[in-house]
UniProtKB/Swiss-Prot annotation:
Keywords: Cell membrane, Membrane, Transmembrane, Transmembrane helix. The chain crosses the membrane at residues 13-35, 40-59, 99-118, 128-150, 157-179, 189-211, 218-240, 255-277, 279-301, 316-338. Belongs to the UPF0324 family. It is a multi-pass membrane protein. This is UPF0324 membrane protein BC_5174.
Length: 340
C-alpha cells in the first residue's frame, strides 16, 4: 500500500514537473518574442526551439514526460479554442467578398502545390500534409490543429511547425526589403502580406512598413485564412481517412472531425457579438498563446535535432518553393482583384 502511494506521488510530481517545464519555457518564449528580430519568429516558434535545446542540453526526466505530453495534446486544444477570441467574423464580413476569394484561392492553391512538391521530394506523407497546411493557412497553429487529423507523430508535428516558422521569418524579411519596389499601395501591400505570409506575427511585422492601413487590412486578410482552418481540417481528415483505406461504419465519435475546432469557432462567434469587453478578450488571447506555447514546448522537448535534420530538409525545400509560388500568386491576385 505504502509502495503504491509512493509510486503515485512520484508520478504526480513528475506530471507537475513536466507541466512546470513547459510553462517556464512558454514564459521565456513570450519575453524573448518581444525582442527585436525575435518578434518576427513569435512566441510559438521560440517555444519549440527552446524545448529542443532543453532536451539536448538538460534532458527530460522520464516521469515528466506525462506532463509534457499532456501539454502538447490537451492544453494545445484548449489553447486553440481560446484563440478563437482573436477572430472577429464581423470584421471579415465588412472586408467584403474579395477578401474571402483571395483567402480561398491561396489556401487551395498552396495546399495542392506544397503537398505535390513534398511528394516529388519524397517527404513522409503526414509531414507533407502538415507543411502544406501550415504554409497555406496559419503557420504553427494550423500544423498542430491538423496533426490529429492525420495522426501525425510529435516529431513530425514539431518539425512541420518549425519549418513553417523559419520560412515565414525569411519571407517576412524579404517582403520588408521589397516593399519600396513592389508598386503597391499600403492597402494593397497589406492584403498581399496577409494573404501570403505564414504566421500572424509574420504578417504584422511585414506589413509594418506600410503603416497602420497596411497592418489593419493584413490582419483581417490573415484572420480570414485562419477562419478557414475549420473546413480545411475536416476535409483533410476525411481525405486522409479515405486515402489510408479506412472502411466500415464508424460512430460519430470516430469521425475525423476536430471537435475542438468548433470551440474555436464558438469563441469567434462570442467575440463577434461583442459580449466580452475588448480588454478581457485581449487577456484571453494572451492566455491562448501561452497554452499553445506550452504545447509547442512539449513538442520541442520530444524532438532531437538529428530528427529535425532527418525529417526536415526535404520538407523545407518543398515549403520554400511552395512559398515562392504563393507569393507570386498573391501578388497577381492583388492586382487582378483591384487591391492595388
Amino acid at each position: 500500500m505504502e509502495q503504491t502511494l509512493v509510486i503515485q506521488k512520484k508520478k504526480g510530481f513528475g506530471f507537475s514537473q513536466g507541466i512546470g517545464i513547459t510553462l517556464l519555457i512558454a514564459i521565456a518564449a513570450k519575453y524573448l518574442a518581444e525582442l527585436p528580430f525575435l518578434n518576427i519568429m513569435g512566441q510559438l516558434v521560440i517555444a519549440i526551439l527552446i524545448g529542443m535545446v532543453w532536451r539536448a542540453a538538460i534532458g527530460v526526466p522520464h516521469d515528466a514526460i506525462a506532463g509534457t505530453n499532456f501539454a502538447s495534446k490537451k492544453l494545445l486544444r484548449f489553447g486553440i479554442i481560446l484563440l478563437g477570441m482573436r477572430l472577429n467574423l464581423v470584421d471579415i464580413a465588412k472586408a467584403g467578398p474579395k477578401v474571402l476569394v483571395i483567402a480561398a484561392v491561396v489556401i487551395t492553391f498552396t495546399i495542392f502545390v506544397v503537398y505535390g512538391l513534398t511528394k516529388v521530394f519524397k517527404v513522409e506523407k503526414k509531414l507533407g500534409i502538415l507543411t502544406a497546411c501550415g504554409t497555406a493557412i496559419c503557420g504553427a497553429a494550423a500544423v498542430v490543429a491538423i496533426a490529429p487529423q492525420v495522426k501525425a507523430k510529435d516529431d513530425e508535428t514539431a518539425v512541420g511547425a518549425a519549418i513553417i516558422a523559419i520560412l515565414g521569418t525569411i519571407f517576412t524579411l524579404i517582403y520588408t526589403l521589397l516593399y519600396p519596389v513592389l508598386g503597391l499601395s499600403p492597402y494593397g501591400y497589406g492584403v498581399f502580406s496577409g494573404a501570403t505570409l505564414h504566421e500572424i506575427a509574420h504578417v504584422i511585422a511585414a506589413a509594418a512598413p506600410g503603416g497602420s492601413t497596411a497592418v489593419d487590412i493584413a490582419v483581417i486578410v490573415k484572420l480570414t485564412r485562419v477562419a478557414m482552418l475549420v473546413p480545411v481540417a475536416i476535409l483533410i481528415g476525411l481525405w486522409f481517412g479515405k486515402s489510408e483505406g479506412s472502411e466500415g461504419k464508424r460512430s460519430w465519435r470516430e469521425l475525423p472531425i476536430p471537435w475542438f475546432i468548433f470551440g474555436f469557432l464558438a469563441m469567434s462567434a462570442v467575440h463577434s457579438l461583442g459580449i466580452i469587453p475588448e480588454v478581457v478578450a485581449g487577456y484571453i488571447v494572451v492566455l491562448a498563446y501561452m497554452l499553445i506555447a506550452m504545447a509547442m514546448a512539449g513538442l520541442g522537448l520530444n524532438v532531437e535535432f538529428k530528427t529535425f535534420r532527418k525529417l526536415g530538409s526535404k520538407a523545407f525545400v518543398a515549403g520554400l518553393i511552395g512559398s515562392v509560388c504563393l507569393s507570386v500568386l498573391g501578388y497577381v491576385l492583388v492586382y487582378a482583384l483591384g487591391f492595388m
